[in-house]
């Protein structure tokens, strides 16, 4: 069972936390991480893009000029794709992109991603994360103190001060523990957990 240092906001170690093997020291299953990520990104797609075909655009179906004798290339309809305002040939049509993944496999993928980040020493645990007032400068100073950037912050319950202090900082995302997902875990270089969030995540993923 791996252990990790717990820090306060001044980067002083205030304790140690034992991490669950099943969540933070699991086998890294790259095929499951790839599948879970592909499914998450696919499910974001609305699939509503559509172009009109020659049968759907407005316009006459009459032959624009006679077949022979004009010197022009033969044409059958002004709604054909080669005409301005004509229909689109082989254009996109509405499509269902939704994919599904069973709970056990999805949990295993998230555990693999967390274990990968843990093995790469990219996880930091805080005893708590809160600010006495809304201050972007205070949040930036906190990030500099820990020498981290491009971070995902996972809390069990974040305050309004924390949310408003970090929202204008680029490459920082704040999530509650129940919104943890494979894409954000793999996207961000560092992950900051509160101690309560670690326990909440372990409780959910160990079910």
UniProtKB/Swiss-Prot annotation:
It holds the Pfam family Ribosomal_L4. Residues 50-75 are annotated as: Disordered. Keywords: Ribonucleoprotein, Ribosomal protein, RNA-binding, rRNA-binding. One of its GO terms (molecular function) is structural constituent of ribosome. GO terms for biological process: translation. The keyword rRNA-binding applies. GO terms for cellular component: ribonucleoprotein complex; ribosome. It comes from the Bacteria. InterPro entries: Ribosomal_uL4, Ribosomal_uL4-like, Ribosomal_uL4_dom_sf. One of the primary rRNA binding proteins, this protein initially binds near the 5'-end of the 23S rRNA. It is important during the early stages of 50S assembly. It makes multiple contacts with different domains of the 23S rRNA in the assembled 50S subunit and ribosome. Forms part of the polypeptide exit tunnel. Part of the 50S ribosomal subunit. Belongs to the universal ribosomal protein uL4 family. This is Large ribosomal subunit protein uL4. It comes from Pelobacter propionicus (strain DSM 2379 / NBRC 103807 / OttBd1). The lineage of its organism: Bacteria, Pseudomonadati, Thermodesulfobacteriota, Desulfuromonadia, Desulfuromonadales. The gene is rplD.
């Amino acid at each position: 069972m791996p252990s990790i240092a717990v820090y306060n906001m001044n980067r002083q170690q205030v304790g140690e936390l034992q991490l669950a093997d099943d969540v933070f020291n699991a086998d890294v299953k790259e095929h499951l991480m790839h599948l879970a990520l592909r499914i998450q990104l696919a499910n974001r797609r609305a699939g509503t893009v559509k172009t009109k075909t020659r049968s759907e655009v407005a316009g006459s179906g009459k032959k624009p000029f006679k077949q022979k004798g004009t010197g022009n290339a033969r044409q059958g309809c002004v709604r054909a794709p080669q005409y301005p305002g004509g229909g689109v040939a082989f254009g996109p049509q509405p499509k269902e992109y939704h994919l599904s993944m069973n709970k056990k496999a999805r949990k295993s993928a998230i555990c693999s991603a967390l274990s990968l980040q843990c093995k790469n020493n990219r996880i930091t645990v805080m005893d708590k994360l809160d600010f006495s007032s809304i201050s972007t400068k205070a949040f930036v100073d906190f990030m500099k103190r820990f020498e981290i950037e491009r971070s995902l912050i996972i809390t069990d319950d974040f305050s309004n001060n924390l949310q408003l202090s970090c929202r204008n900082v680029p490459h920082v995302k704040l999530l509650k523990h129940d919104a943890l997902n494979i894409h954000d875990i793999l996207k961000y270089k560092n992950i900051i957990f509160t101690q309560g969030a670690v326990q909440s995540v372990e409780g959910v993923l160990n079910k």
